[in-house]
A protein has these predicted regions:
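Non-heme di-metal
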Residues: 1-192
Length: 192
């Protein structure tokens, strides 16, 4: 480990933890999307695919900072337990809430104390995206539980993912630029 990494040991460990978590979330949400399509919840599948792409962006950003600090980014991808789409949405929401309420705030506090602007930036981008994922998962759960047959969870739909920070939106008209990193809206990836 380089001197730079040694000086930021706690932040590097937090980055590794976040990298592994986001890498596993990508794998999990990809598997959940397949199950949602099988159950004909194509809108929920679109949401899982968009969230999976965002998590992939987060893991890439975390890995970049780890390498910048002289560390190595390696993730152990765990087997995914796939259940019903409703159960998968609830599991995804639980994971997002943990990241919002605990993990990323703690990691941001440590990075801020160490004045590590690159870590602050990658953690902030991930945290803000997780907030939109949690909102969207909550909406999907409510629609599934409510049993509305015309709800968006049944038909494939577009979601918009910032290629820089992973911010995710469910509407094209929301922004001219990413509200988190200022990336131009026209660069957003459309995920269906």
């Amino acid at each position: 480990m380089s001197l730079v990494a040694a000086e930021n040991t706690a932040t590097v460990q937090n980055l590794r933890t976040a990298f592994e978590g986001e890498s596993n979330a990508h794998a999990k949400y990809t598997a959940f999307a397949i199950k949602a399509d099988q159950e004909e919840f194509h809108g929920a599948a679109s949401l899982f695919r968009a969230a999976a792409r965002a998590e992939q962006i987060h893991s890439t950003n975390h890995a970049r900072v780890i390498r910048m600090l002289g560390g190595h980014a390696e993730a152990e991808i765990h087997p995914v337990e796939v259940k019903s789409t409703l159960e998968n949405l609830k599991a995804a929401l639980g994971g997002e809430q943990y990241e919002i309420d605990s993990m990323y705030p703690d990691f941001l506090e440590e990075a801020t104390a160490g004045k590590n602007t690159a870590a602050i930036r990658t953690f902030t981008g991930a945290l803000e995206a997780e907030k939109t994922h949690a909102r969207l998962y909550g909406e999907a759960i409510a629609l599934l539980v409510g049993g509305k047959k015309d709800a968006w969870i049944f038909a494939a739909r577009d979601f918009y993912v910032c290629p820089v920070c992973g911010y995710t939106s469910d509407t094209e008209e929301e922004h001219e630029r990413c509200p988190v990193c200022n990336c131009p809206w026209e660069k957003f990836e459309i995920i269906r």
